[in-house]
């Protein structure tokens, strides 16, 4: 026993001495980098990245110190994460040294870059940091002076000069129904005081939290008011008349004081991650499922009566024998097994329409008190990309209602909950990109002239994805492509540490293994934003690329067919590695937008459409638009009743047998329209699928720019060439200002950003 105790003591001393050795190395390398920063300054070479590295290290030294003294607390937090549960104590014990080793790697990389700058091996454009006090919105761009800018911050990050300077200055003000003091609509004095004393002149947004309601509402509007919810973040019944009274009073009492504040510039976020799931799935658990109130059921009865006119018509469609519409309640909730039936369609459509109506009301009430207000919602686009069964969320309609394209788009480094979340992206790709790519392309297709604001970016981590050993190149890949696809501002999830490294209270499973324990990951996000802002005009040009191919999306087919979005992804995936900026078409996009914005619409896996969707496509054909379609689409309406066939009078409807035929036809069609890129990127591999996604543009000054990202699991040999020229291209690495190979080998996650010219 004594020998064992002695061994433990020696092990502890060994770890302690090793940790002290790491700290000495950090101090030494900090001194080296500080000296190099001074030399760069003297040579008038931009050194902002090196200062960022020094500040990142300074912050994480405090974090590592706190972690050394709080192993038990970190052990508890690691136990909350599925992949770390069994080795939580080991993870917590090793964390401080992991952070220190990561800081040393960051310092080594920064020292190497600084030396290369000093010797002229690489070059760097001067970085102009965005002035958060002077941000303006110009259509779909954030500008600082005459230059586009991209803004980035973190959820819950403390406001200090050091953190604000290097990690974002977004100003967030929260209002909530809990601030309505009584049924008269009076606002709590502390809320008014806080608004009046807020003198910030920085860009920000108002977070309208729906999570807390005052106790008096349960007496005034009934106990059920707080029991019927839109879980997990809307804690009251939106169909109870009291909801409108409560929110009207909140806006009436707060918005007149908020309306001239700079932090309303990025709008009022009307709710956090909205969803209203009511369906059942046999005996399986449906996440965040909630019953509905009699108010909702009564609305549904009226909705059905307006739609179907008579109970006989409803019975005929639903295959029921109801006596009158008031008997509808006994058929609710709908079950997932009923998907594809008229009953399922009616409920899910009604559920979306009542939610749209609710947000239309909130926007109208807000505008009464601030006519210039912009609104957005923190919608999870995974509801769209994963074809969520019934969330009450119509992403297109709610984006049309918004003035800013709100979202909390995610990417997936891994899947830490495979039993709960099915995914198969890792068979071909190094990270899950479906939501990231399709989400932004869908938003950009709906409202191309609005900014995209990801107010809770899950590109780094989330409840289903996390890895303490994350490759920092993943960070660059995801944030780089997100901005090329249209992202303008983001608030990344998340920064739960205080200045001394201590943690916020009541942390759940979202913390352990995330960015506040990863110095290089944290650095790389800001490092990427520096490059994006340095080349902001070029990145904005990529954002505004014309989208010549539009993939048709039918919310009708999505409701009625569980795997509908898998088919849509199959189309998207086929074309995402051909250098083409992709977009979507819907009934509304076809009817409301200039059809010159695209060349062809692809329709695949879309059996069910409404008559209005059918008519929109038929009119598009009649006006000379081109459609490529599979033979299984546009067969029946929302209720399964057969539709007539689309007609073509100008040989502009192409009905093909396979997805491969559709892909080849789409590319040949663009070739005939001279709509393919001037640059060609060829993958020199034996693989039967491509993994390098790329886009190229020609700027207003005639420069050819090319961006490539390797989404695959293996390195790829590429060849860059011109589509219509014999000459060999000359490539220049824009970020490092040096020549680049026209036959690069890209590792997984690697970003290749070059200017391409003739030799």
Regions found by a protein language model. Name each.
Residues 112-167:
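N-terminal carbohydrate-binding accessory modules
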Residues 78, 86-131, 137, 274, ...:
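Carbohydrate-binding surfaces of carbohydrate-active enzymes
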Residues 156-168, 250-253, 387-398, 471-479, ...:
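Short, acidic/polar
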Residues 20-106:
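Long, low-complexity or tandemly repetitive, helically biased scaffold regions used
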Residues 148-157, 173-184, 227-249, 289-290, ...:
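The substrate-binding groove and active-site-proximal loops of carbohydrate-active enzymes
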Residues 161-259, 361-369:
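Aromatic-lined substrate-binding rim segments of carbohydrate-active enzymes
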Residues 230-436, 442:
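Polysaccharide-binding and catalytic clefts of secreted carbohydrate-active enzymes
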Residues 4-14:
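Sec-dependent N-terminal signal peptides
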């Amino acid at each position: 026993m004594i020998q064992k105790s002695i061994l433990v003591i020696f092990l502890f001393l060994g770890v302690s001495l090793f940790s002290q050795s790491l700290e000495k190395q950090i101090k030494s390398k900090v001194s080296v980098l500080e000296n190099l920063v001074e030399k760069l300054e003297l040579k008038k070479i931009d050194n902002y990245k090196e200062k960022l590295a020094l500040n990142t290290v300074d912050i994480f030294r405090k974090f590592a110190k706190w972690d050394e003294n709080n192993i038990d607390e970190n052990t508890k937090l690691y136990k909350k994460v599925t992949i770390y549960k069994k080795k939580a104590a080991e993870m917590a014990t090793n964390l401080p040294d992991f952070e220190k080793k990561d800081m040393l790697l960051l310092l080594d990389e920064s020292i190497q870059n600084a030396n290369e700058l000093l010797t002229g091996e690489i070059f760097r454009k001067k970085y102009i940091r965005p002035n958060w006090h002077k941000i303006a919105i110009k259509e779909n761009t954030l500008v600082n002076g005459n230059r586009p800018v991209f803004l980035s911050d973190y959820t819950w990050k403390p406001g200090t000069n050091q953190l604000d300077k290097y990690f974002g200055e977004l100003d967030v003000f929260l209002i909530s129904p809990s601030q309505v003091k009584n049924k008269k609509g009076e606002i709590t004095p502390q809320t008014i005081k806080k608004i009046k004393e807020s003198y910030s002149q920085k860009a920000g947004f108002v977070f309208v939290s729906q999570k807390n309601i005052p106790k008096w509402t349960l007496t005034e509007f009934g106990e059920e008011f707080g029991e019927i919810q839109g879980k997990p973040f809307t804690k009251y019944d939106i169909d109870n008349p009291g909801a409108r009274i409560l929110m009207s009073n909140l806006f009436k009492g707060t918005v007149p004081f908020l309306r001239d504040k700079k932090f309303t510039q990025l709008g009022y976020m009307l709710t956090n991650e909205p969803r209203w799931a009511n369906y059942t799935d046999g005996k399986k658990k449906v996440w965040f499922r909630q019953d509905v109130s009699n108010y909702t059921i009564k609305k549904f009865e009226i909705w059905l009566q307006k739609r179907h006119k008579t109970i006989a018509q409803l019975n005929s469609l639903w295959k029921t024998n109801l006596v009158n519409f008031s008997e509808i309640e006994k058929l609710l909730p709908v079950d997932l097994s009923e998907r594809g039936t008229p009953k399922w369609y009616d409920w899910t459509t009604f559920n979306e329409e009542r939610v749209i109506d609710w947000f239309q009301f909130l926007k109208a009430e807000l505008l009464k008190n601030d006519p210039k207000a912009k609104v957005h919602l923190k919608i999870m686009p995974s509801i769209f990309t994963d074809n969520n069964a019934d969330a009450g969320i119509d992403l297109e309609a709610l984006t049309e209602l918004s003035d800013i394209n709100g979202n909390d788009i995610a990417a997936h480094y891994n899947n830490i909950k495979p039993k709960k979340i099915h995914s198969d992206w890792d068979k071909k790709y190094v990270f899950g990109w479906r939501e990231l790519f399709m989400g932004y392309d869908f938003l950009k297709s709906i409202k191309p002239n609005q900014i995209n604001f990801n107010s809770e970016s899950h590109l780094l981590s989330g409840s289903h994805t996390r890895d303490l050993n994350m490759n920092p190149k993943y960070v660059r890949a995801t944030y780089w492509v997100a901005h090329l696809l249209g992202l303008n501002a983001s608030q990344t999830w998340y920064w739960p540490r205080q200045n001394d490294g201590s943690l916020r209270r009541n942390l759940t499973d979202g913390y352990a293994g995330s960015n506040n324990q990863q110095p290089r990951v944290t650095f790389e996000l800001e490092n990427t934003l520096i490059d994006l802002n340095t080349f902001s005009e070029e990145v904005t040009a990529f954002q505004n690329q014309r989208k010549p191919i539009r993939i048709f999306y039918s919310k009708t087919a999505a409701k009625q067919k569980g795997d509908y979005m898998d088919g849509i992804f199959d189309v998207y995936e086929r074309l995402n590695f051909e250098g083409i900026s992709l977009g979507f078409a819907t009934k509304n996009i076809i009817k409301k937008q200039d059809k010159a914005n695209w060349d062809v619409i692809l329709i695949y896996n879309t059996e069910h459409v409404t008559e209005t969707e059918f008519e929109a496509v038929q009119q598009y054909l009649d006006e000379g638009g081109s459609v490529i379609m599979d033979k299984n689409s546009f067969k029946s309406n929302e209720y399964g009743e057969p539709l007539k066939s689309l007609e073509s009078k100008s040989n502009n409807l192409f009905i093909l047998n396979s997805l491969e035929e559709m892909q080849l036809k789409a590319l040949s069609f663009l070739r005939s329209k001279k709509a393919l890129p001037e640059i060609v990127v060829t993958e020199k591999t034996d693989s039967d699928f491509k993994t390098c996604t790329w886009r190229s543009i020609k700027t207003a000054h005639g420069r050819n720019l090319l961006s490539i990202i390797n989404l695959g699991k293996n390195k790829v040999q590429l060849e860059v060439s011109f589509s219509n020229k014999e000459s060999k291209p000359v490539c220049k690495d824009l970020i490092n200002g040096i020549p680049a190979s026209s036959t690069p080998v890209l590792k997984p996650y690697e970003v290749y950003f070059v200017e391409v010219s003739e030799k």
